[in-house]
């Protein structure tokens, strides 16, 4: 072939080869160019490319090598001599982004010169160097191979025709080299882009292997840049890996910028060689018979199997699965797609680290495109995969909406043939799509998402089984996010009867569902957008305001919910209401707390005797509660109250809000009973600042009065964060709480008051074993998250979870964080606006569920089960021993000076460690190891000034036990990690007698592990039954007595049964399972006797016998199957009996008196032991006995003294330190 013809052929071949890789690009050839032609070509290409990448391919065969300065050679105008072209000039013409290919000997000289230029360049030029890529055929000192085995332009051949080049090179080195004609390689049938042909499958395998090599050896950011952002760049670098492998066999080392690590010996090349050998072995037959059926290579099947093996044994701590890029390629094949998606789903379920790896390999565009398929079998697994992706990377929402992916999930959510757990995942995906993304909100609203969610929130048949709680939760969260700061969607929701539908969920047993419903309702409340307040839309605005007020009425009724998560969402929602209705609430507040009305406030009608069931039903929630305004309206002197309440109806006297709003929030609450002022300051000159979007006119002043009273209640919530939100809401309306009982002095200084908040803004719930934490280990469940399981009431099992307000912010990778900023009760600044709203946390916290493994059980559960089984064995052994023991308690094995200022009020022996917990009236809690005589931990139950302790109780004793601290004002706080020095965490807190102010400060408690019930009562006519599993008040039992309750004891045998001792010395037994509740009444103590100070069911498993002790000193033994008269009486003390303890299993009881004496009795009335003196040389008397408690499984007795603050522990003579 003549030289000019050869030159033209080379150029056309190179053009066609590049065009195969990027057919849409424009290519321009310059054969033997001059300097001016190169410059013009570069400038023209950059002009047309604009900001796109320009490829510059230099074939330097037949011209001198590059100079030491990195100059390449071109011709002058007359083609009489070579002229050097510096790389700096080339770079200045092409600019960036660009990619250079230099196929010539000593090509490394050019790369070296380019790198030196980068070092000399300014920082701005260096910053654009990432957009410049160089591929060079060899290093600076190397010459290209001239062997007949390789073509002259072997580097270019590898970059542009990799399959044929790889097969030729492999054939010369395989066992096929003698039996196969090499020219057949050029006749491989098929098309490169058709995976069902031999050439297409080989190209597919080659792509998968080179991607796998690159992903496993390159940093992930470099892999993304080179292999996932530009199709041509990705193809060139895949082929560059082949060039390195082939040319290194000829002692040439291709180099690149950015520099890649060596890959020519990677073991995945062996997989390529095997695939190539299988192909070449079939090639003669396929060429001889073009109609022969094509048999796919087993490569992808084998790689998927290898990936599956890794899934069975791999973990985050092990090396990542190298097959991940291959799995991605397999998604392109319909025959392997389902299996690949299933395996990919299993991998993503391993945790956020797995999702991050999958995203780094480039999964996103593949699974995005799959949303366009209509294959029914892929729906469940695609929803699962997208759930896992979005649980880590919210930014994917933009591309999902852009490609219409939201419609796919709306259709899935609306399909009844999918499992509820899977539809919950679809709701989660949609919630992420609309989260803070107005385009997503508009798209989903226009697609009817509001109507779909509302339709599935309400069962078609009221008798249908309860919807999966996880689905209810995420339907509410999805609606809330759709309505958030989107007035048009809010209006659609109000017009679609959304409040009435969502309000029905406020009585659901799951706190997560209730909190999510509150979140949705709260986002229906407009925080003050003026868009709907125009003069032409007054009637529409009135309707909107009425709807908002109905929403707020329902929220006010659950402001005393047992779950801090729910109460926190209520507080956030009510703060939104305070902003949107700021003007009118402030005017009502000003009227409420005018100084001249103080005398009237003292005459507020007492609501203390109004009974509160506090068990919310959907109907009562929907009815509203504006009737409360009729109780306080005349006193508040708000003119429209009466008409408003007459129009909207009155609540029943059993409504929980009727007894808690005013009595808790008014100046006559317990905190101000000793003071003439209200403890509330009205900031007359408080500026609205950014709160000028208030409504143009009031609709119902009664609701504003009720709102203020409730927020005063919220501002005293036992959970610090909720209290701080309440104070912030009060400050928004110009009201500030001040300490009504001056902070008590502690250590010479003022003790922090209620305004304090935790040092951490962490918040949320962490279930120890909740309905959404139970994981299914059966993969055949088709990516279902497990459904709710009803409580398994089993002895020694009991409560499975208690809500935790501890929040883990690493759940989502979000730049703005997950936790809400700390709040204080300081006055709001004059420029306050939307940024002062406390953040809702239920959504971000709920997202954490999907970032955890859903398909497999966790090792933590296995460890917990093993620990529980071991503790059950220990407990049974100890029970058997103590039942056979003498129980004489004659040996004092430990004595601990707690240094409590007011003496020891309560003590508790832990069942599986030598630990005793003690507390005083100031609610200081101290933990001590009595075997080692060492302190373990000390902390305060709270930092409020009002103090008083009632009881210490242990929850989940066979698991990671929780410490319940009951305060005498009815507040309950539950702690975990209380035996770790400084590691205690507040799990939950709530008021157990919310609204019963007449109960005073004498609330008594007891806990029933089997049922998960906490019983609370006091100087009141009702006994409140709280389900701590549901975090909900489930029953209010009327005591039918004329006096209050002084002692409570729950049966450890019969769920729902408990005994109560009264101030009038009577005894009653109740059972929540019976219609009448009351099952036994007796007056075993003498007439006009003092109150019952202790009561308990007798040891063992007999549910019919109880023991009651009165302050007069007598102990009565009762059998409920007989008459109400006692069958045994012990005159234990002559008055001043202060404490009674009944062992759970051993046949022994103990009593203690203020006269420094402890007596131990058998169940037959025999006095086993009397303790008067300390076992010391001086023989001092023991202190006045404030509390007694037995070890649950051993013959150990702890006694706390009231005067000398000692806690003494007594045992049998043969006690041995464990």
Swiss-Prot record:
Domain of life, source organism: Eukaryota
In terms of Pfam families, this protein maps to: Raptor_N, WD40
Xref: InterPro entries: ARM-like, ARM-type_fold, Raptor, Raptor_N, WD40/YVTN_repeat-like_dom_sf, WD40_repeat_dom_sf, WD40_rpt
Output compositional bias ranges, type Polar residues. Answer: 640-663
Record's SUPFAM superfamilies? ARM repeat, WD40 repeat-like
One of the record's GO molecular function terms: protein-macromolecule adaptor activity
Got a GO cellular component term for this one?
Answer: cytoplasm
Compositionally biased residues, Low complexity: 664-677
Question: Which GO BP terms, alphabetically?
Answer: cellular response to amino acid stimulus; cellular response to starvation; positive regulation of cell growth; regulation of autophagy; TOR signaling
PROSITE patterns in the cross-refs? WD_REPEATS_2, WD_REPEATS_REGION
**Where do the WD repeats start and stop?**
899-938, 945-985, 997-1036, 1040-1080, 1087-1128, 1132-1171, 1180-1218
Region annotation Disordered: where it falls in the sequence: 640-677
Q: How does it assemble?
A: The target of rapamycin complex 1 (TORC1) is composed of at least RAPTOR, LST8 and TOR.
- Protein name, as recorded: Regulatory-associated protein of TOR 1
From what organism does this protein derive? Oryza sativa subsp. japonica
């Amino acid at each position: 072939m003549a030289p000019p013809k050869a030159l033209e052929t080379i150029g056309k071949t190179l053009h066609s080869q590049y065009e195969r890789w990027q057919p849409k690009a424009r290519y321009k050839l310059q054969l033997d160019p001059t300097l001016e032609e190169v410059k013009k070509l570069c400038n023209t290409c950059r002009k047309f490319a604009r900001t796109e990448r320009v490829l510059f391919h230099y074939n330097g065969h037949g011209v001198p090598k590059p100079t030491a300065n990195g100059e390449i050679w071109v011709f002058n105008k007359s083609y009489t001599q070579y002229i050097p072209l510096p790389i700096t000039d080339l770079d200045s013409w092409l600019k960036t982004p660009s990619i250079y290919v230099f196929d010539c000997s000593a090509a490394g000289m050019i790369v070296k010169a380019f790198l030196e230029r980068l070092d000399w360049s300014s920082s701005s030029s260096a910053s654009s160097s990432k957009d410049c890529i160089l591929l060079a055929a060899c290093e600076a000192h190397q010459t290209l191979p001239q062997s007949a085995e390789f073509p002259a332009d072997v580097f270019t051949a590898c970059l542009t025709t990799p399959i044929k080049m790889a097969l030729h090179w492999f054939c010369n080195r395989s066992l096929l080299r003698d039996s196969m004609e090499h020219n057949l390689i050029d006749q491989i049938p098929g098309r490169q882009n058709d995976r069902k042909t031999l050439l297409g499958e080989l190209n597919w395998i080659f792509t998968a292997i080179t991607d796998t090599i690159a992903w496993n050896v390159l940093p992930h950011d470099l892999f993304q840049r080179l292999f996932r952002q530009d199709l041509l760049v990705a193809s060139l670098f895949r082929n560059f890996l082949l060039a390195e492998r082939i040319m290194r066999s000829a002692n040439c080392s291709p180099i690149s910028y950015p520099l890649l690590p060596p890959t020519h010996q990677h073991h995945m090349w062996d997989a390529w060689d095997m695939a190539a050998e299988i192909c070449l072995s079939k090639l003669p037959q396929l060429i001889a018979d073009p109609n022969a059926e094509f048999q796919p290579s087993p490569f992808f099947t084998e790689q998927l199997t290898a990936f599956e093996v890794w899934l069975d044994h791999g973990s985050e701590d092990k090396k990542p699965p190298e097959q991940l890029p291959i799995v991605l390629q397999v998604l392109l094949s319909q025959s392997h797609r389902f299996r690949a998606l299933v395996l990919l789903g299993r991998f993503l379920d391993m945790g956020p680290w797995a999702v991050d790896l999958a995203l780094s390999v480039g999964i996103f565009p593949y699974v995005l495109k799959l949303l366009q398929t209509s294959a029914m079998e892929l729906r469940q697994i695609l929803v699962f995969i997208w759930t896992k992706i979005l649980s880590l990377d919210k930014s994917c929402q933009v591309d999902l909406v852009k490609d219409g992916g939201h419609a796919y999930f709306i259709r899935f959510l609306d399909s009844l043939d999918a499992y509820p757990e899977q539809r919950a995942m679809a709701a989660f995906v949609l919630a992420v799509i609309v989260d803070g993304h107005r385009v997503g909100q508009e798209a989903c609203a226009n697609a009817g998402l509001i109507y779909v969610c509302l339709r599935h929130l309400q069962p078609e048949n009221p008798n249908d089984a309860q919807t999966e709680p996880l689905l209810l939760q995420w339907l509410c969260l999805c609606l809330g996010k759709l309505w958030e700061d989107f007035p048009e969607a809010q209006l659609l929701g109000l017009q679609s009867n959304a409040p009435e539908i969502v309000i029905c969920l406020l009585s659901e047993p799951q706190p997560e569902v209730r909190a999510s419903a509150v979140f949705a309702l709260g986002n229906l409340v407009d925080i003050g957008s003026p868009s709907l307040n125009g003069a032409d839309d007054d009637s529409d605005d009135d309707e909107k305001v009425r709807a908002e007020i109905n929403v707020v009425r329902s929220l006010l009724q659950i402001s005393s919910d047992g779950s801090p998560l729910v109460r926190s969402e209520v507080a956030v929602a009510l703060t939104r209401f305070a902003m949107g209705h700021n003007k009118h609430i402030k005017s009502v507040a000003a009227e409420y707390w005018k100084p001249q009305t103080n005398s009237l406030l003292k005459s507020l009608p007492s609501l203390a005797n109004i009974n509160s069931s506090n068990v919310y039903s959907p109907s009562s929630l929907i009815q509203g509660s504006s009737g409360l305004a009729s109780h306080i309206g005349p006193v508040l002197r708000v003119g429209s109250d009466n008409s408003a309440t007459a129009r909207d109806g009155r609540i029943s006297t059993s409504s929980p809000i009727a007894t808690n709003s005013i009595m808790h929030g008014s100046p006559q609450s317990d905190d101000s009973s000793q003071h003439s002022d209200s403890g509330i300051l009205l900031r007359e000159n408080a500026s609205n600042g950014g709160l000028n979007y208030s409504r143009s006119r009031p609709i119902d002043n009664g609701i504003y009065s009720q709102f203020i009273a409730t927020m005063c209640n919220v501002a005293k919530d036992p959970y610090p964060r909720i209290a701080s939100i309440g104070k912030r809401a009060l400050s928004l309306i110009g009201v500030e709480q001040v300490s009504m009982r001056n902070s008590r002095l502690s250590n010479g200084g003022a003790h922090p008051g209620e305004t304090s908040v935790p040092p951490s803004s962490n918040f949320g719930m962490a279930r120890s074993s909740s309905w959404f934490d139970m994981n299914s280990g059966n993969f055949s469940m088709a990516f279902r998250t497990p459904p709710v399981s009803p409580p398994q009431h089993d002895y020694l099992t009991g409560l499975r979870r208690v809500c935790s307000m501890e929040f883990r912010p690493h759940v989502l990778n979000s730049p703005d964080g997950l936790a809400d900023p700390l709040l204080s009760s300081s006055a709001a600044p004059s420029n306050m606006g939307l940024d002062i709203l406390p953040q809702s946390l239920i959504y971000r916290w709920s997202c954490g569920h999907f970032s955890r493994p859903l398909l497999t059980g966790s090792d933590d559960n296995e460890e917990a089960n093993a620990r529980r089984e071991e503790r059950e064995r220990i407990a049974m052994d100890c029970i058997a021993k103590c039942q056979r023991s003498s129980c004489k308690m004659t040996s004092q094995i430990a004595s601990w000076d707690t240094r409590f200022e007011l003496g020891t009020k309560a003590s508790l022996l832990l069942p599986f460690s030598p630990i005793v917990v003690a507390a005083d009236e100031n609610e200081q809690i101290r933990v001590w190891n009595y075997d080692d005589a060492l302190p373990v931990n000390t902390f305060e139950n709270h930092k409020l000034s009002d103090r008083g302790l009632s009881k210490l109780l242990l929850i989940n004793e066979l698991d990671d036990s929780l410490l319940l601290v009951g305060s005498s004002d009815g507040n309950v706080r539950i702690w975990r990690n209380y035996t770790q020095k400084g590691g205690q965490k507040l799990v939950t807190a709530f008021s157990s007698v919310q609204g019963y102010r007449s109960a005073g400060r004498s609330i008594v408690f007891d806990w029933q592990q089997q049922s998960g019930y906490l019983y609370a009562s006091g100087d009141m006519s009702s006994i409140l039954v709280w389900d701590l599993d549901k975090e909900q008040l489930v029953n209010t039992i009327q005591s039918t007595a004329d006096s209050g309750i002084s002692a409570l004891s729950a049966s450890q045998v019969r769920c729902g049964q408990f005994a109560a001792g009264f101030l009038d010395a009577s005894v009653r037994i109740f059972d929540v399972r019976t219609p009448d509740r009351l099952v036994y009444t007796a007056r075993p103590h003498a007439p006009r006797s003092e109150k019952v100070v202790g009561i308990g069911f007798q040891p063992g498993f007999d549910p019919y016998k109880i023991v009651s002790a009165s302050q007069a000193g007598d102990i009565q033994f009762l059998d409920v199957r007989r008459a109400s008269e006692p069958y045994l009486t012990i005159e234990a003390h002559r008055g001043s009996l202060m404490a009674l303890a009944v062992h759970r299993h051993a046949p022994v009881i103990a009593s203690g008196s203020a006269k420094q004496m402890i007596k131990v009795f058998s169940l037959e009335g025999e006095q086993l032991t009397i303790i008067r003196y300390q076992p010391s040389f001086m023989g001092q008397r023991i202190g006045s006995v404030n509390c007694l408690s037995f070890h649950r499984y051993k013959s150990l007795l702890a006694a706390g003294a009231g005067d000398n603050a000692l806690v003494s522990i007594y045992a049998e003579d043969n006690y041995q330190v464990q």
